[in-house]
Swiss-Prot record:
Quaternary structure annotation from Swiss-Prot or TrEMBL: Homodimer.
Listed name of the protein: 1-deoxy-D-xylulose-5-phosphate synthase
Function of the molecule: Catalyzes the acyloin condensation reaction between C atoms 2 and 3 of pyruvate and glyceraldehyde 3-phosphate to yield 1-deoxy-D-xylulose-5-phosphate (DXP).
Keyword S-adenosyl-L-methionine found: no
Catalytic activity: D-glyceraldehyde 3-phosphate + pyruvate + H(+) = 1-deoxy-D-xylulose 5-phosphate + CO2
GO CC entries: cytosol
Binding site for thiamine diphosphate: H74, G115, H116, A117, G147, A148, N175, Y285, E368
Origin species: Anaeromyxobacter dehalogenans (strain 2CP-1 / ATCC BAA-258)
One Pfam family this sequence matches: DXP_synthase_N
Length: 636
């Protein structure tokens, strides 16, 4: 007998499956997710924990007319399987395959593109309001994880949704990793009662009665508070009720039959409602359920039988691990140093700092804006905070970087993990913009280490600097260099990484870890008789204009390389320096290599670097073209 899952090519097919068979379908979906994530990596735990919610939603609502908006998208693997992408699911997070997150261009069932947290409620409210304006039929549901509820924008959306009173359904998928629910016999009893027609009919009848009494609105408000008072005492819903939502729950988020029944009732409810569903992250897969730290949050390839990562050949440590070790050394030597992250203790490596220095390591939740201003407050009182956040997520705190830190010249260090191209996580997670959006901030020192030692030196330098500083480093392994004791670098001074005797044909200025590819390109060019010098600028701001302009002027041709956006980035900084020094008027030939004006999709990092033209082959080709073009025109 074949799988139920193989009969489902759309939500319409799912609706034909009897409710009694849905638990078996959920098990098949779990098995498919586990097998695929073992091969491709991905957000296993969140998706396993939300299978029943996915199935019940699609069984009751009618996507794409009804809009299902997934916060972050970690929970949406089952959604992809149920919406015509079953066969393509094996390609998820691979080159040319499905994205790891919902994307509007991928399917009409992906109502909103996501990847960053806490946005679903605001987006869903916009959709339901658009339906009101246009008269288009359909329901809108936002599915939000409890972790996303630590983000302020989620409550901004709740606040307006409650005020407007639209028929918005918010499903809070609480996997007990952030929120501690108030559960028990009374809570369970109230959950059933508050979702029932009887309870809501009673509320409506009381209201209708009071409206016939003079000064009814005031009386209604008094009685409404009385009705809700007992409920608020025994459920965690008081906050949501206070924001204008009708609260239902907690309910068992793995009881798919019960969820179908509840969604059927809530689909006809008038007004904003929040359903609180308790789930288990990693549900149905013991290795994920038993991982108390992350429960299979974001995994690379793993062995299905054990849940353990598939070991690749031994190599250099990841930059993330090296940063964490260097930070712990700094914290050990200087009690003023503290570490801050936004719900990414594991991802940024700060779990090591938390274990060694629990009272000086802060996880503020998905609250990047708060993290930066919290750091600013600490810095005001003599503390040396290090804010470790993925490059893509620090974008959310840009105003705080400028207004709360840089404007006041506070000594806050920003450690930007995942700077540059990130691989399988794709468009929403690329760290492409940091060099551009940071280098324009007055007084902010911006550093890009080319190897592990440079990372250690730059962290140490930032903590000795009396002002704001940022260092960005990539995802993945380091270069494998022997580690040196950390030392203070002279701010604004780069180094000549490769010199040649006499007059060079071309100079390559390579920011950060693009230095390795630049050196490889220079060696390949040397074999062809093309002499190339290579500069490691170290600092994107302040730029070492003396060194860079001197080497560019010596060669008369220069290629800049960065793993960041070309618009406003490191290459632009060099162009500005060349302009100031009169090198452009003197005929300097310039080529800039970096990420073009587009969002780079998911693939292996090496392939992405080849796509955008910053690998060794592309750098060598750019140098050849520049040298050949100049010689063809008779320019020395």
């Amino acid at each position: 007998m074949g799988r139920l899952l193989d009969t489902i090519d759309s939500p319409t097919d799912l609706k034909k499956v009897p409710v009694e068979q849905l638990p078996a379908l959920c098990q098949e979906i779990r098995e498919q997710i586990i097998q695929t994530c073992a091969r491709n990596g991905g957000h296993l735990g969140s998706s396993l924990g939300a299978v029943e919610i996915n199935v019940a939603l699609h069984h009751v609502f009618s996507s794409p007319q009804d809009k299902l908006v997934w916060d972050v998208g970690h929970q949406a693997y089952a959604h992809k399987l149920l919406t015509g992408r079953r066969e393509a699911f094996r390609t998820i997070r691979t080159e040319g395959g499905l994205a790891g997150f919902p994307e509007r261009h991928e399917s009409a069932h992906d109502a909103f593109g996501v990847g960053h947290a806490s946005t679903a409620i605001s987006a869903a409210l916009g959709m339901i309001e658009a339906k009101r304006v246009t008269g288009e039929p359909g329901k809108v549901v936002a599915v939000v994880g409890d972790g996303a509820m630590t983000g302020g924008v989620a409550f901004e959306g709740l606040n307006q949704a409650g005020y407007l009173g639209r028929n918005l359904l918010v499903v809070l998928n609480d996997n007990e990793m952030s929120i501690s629910p108030n559960v028990g016999a009374l809570s369970e009893w109230f959950s059933k009662k508050f979702a029932s027609r009887t309870y809501n009919r009673w509320r409506r009848q009381v209201k209708e009665f009071l409206e016939s009494v003079p000064k009814g609105p005031e009386a209604i408000e008094i009685i409404r508070h009385g009705i809700n008072a007992t409920k608020a005492l025994v459920t965690p819903g008081i906050l949501f009720e206070g924001l204008g939502f009708h609260y239902v729950g907690p309910v068992d988020g793995h009881d798919v039959k019960g969820l179908v029944e509840t969604f059927q009732k809530l689909a006809i409810f008038d007004g904003p409602v929040l359903l609180h569903a308790i789930t288990t992250k990693g549900k149905g897969y013991h290795p994920a359920e038993s991982d108390k730290a992350t429960r299979g949050h974001g995994l690379s390839f793993f062995d299905v039988a054990t849940g353990k990562p598939v070991k690749k050949s031994p190599g250099a440590k990841a930059y993330t691990d090296l940063f964490a070790e260097a930070l712990c050394e700094e914290m050990e030597h200087d009690p003023r140093v503290v570490a801050i992250t936004a719900a990414m203790l594991e991802g940024t490596g700060l779990i090591k700092a938390k274990q060694r220095f629990p009272d000086r390591t802060y996880d503020v939740g998905i609250a990047e804006q708060h993290a930066v201003t919290f750091a600013a407050g600490l810095a005001c009182e003599g503390i040396r905070p290090v804010v470790a956040i993925y490059s893509t997520f620090l974008q959310r705190a840009y105003d705080q970087i400028i207004h709360d830190v840089a404007l006041q010249k506070l000594p806050v260090t920003f450690a930007l993990d995942r700077g540059g191209l990130v691989g399988a996580d794709g468009k929403t997670h690329q760290g492409a913009f940091d060099l551009a959006y940071l280098r324009c901030v007055p007084g902010l020192v911006v550093m890009a280490p080319s190897d592990e030692n440079e990372l250690r030196h730059m962290l140490h330098t930032s903590l000795q600097h009396d002002g704001p500083a940022a260092l960005r480093y990539p995802r993945g392994a380091g270069e494998g260099v022997a580690l040196e004791p950390a030392r203070v670098l002279e701010i604004g001074k780069g180094r000549l990484a490769r010199n040649v005797p006499g007059k060079p044909d071309v100079c390559v200025v390579a920011a950060g870890t693009t230095l390795k590819a630049a050196l490889a390109a220079a060696e390949a060019l040397a074999a062809e008789g093309v002499a190339a010098t290579v500069v490691d600028p170290r600092f994107v701001k302040p730029l070492d204009e003396e060194l860079i302009c001197a080497e560019a002027g010596r060669a008369k041709r220069v290629v800049t390389v960065e793993e960041g956006c070309l618009a406003g980035g490191f290459g632009t900084a060099c162009l500005e320096a060349f302009e100031r020094r009169g090198l452009l008027e003197a005929g300097l030939g310039v080529r800039r290599l970096g990420i073009p004006d587009e969002f780079i999709t998911h693939a292996e990092q090496a392939k992405q670097r080849a796509w955008v033209g910053i690998d060794a082959d592309a750098i060598a080709a750019a140098c050849r073209a520049l040298v050949g073009d100049r010689k063809a025109r008779g320019v020395a």
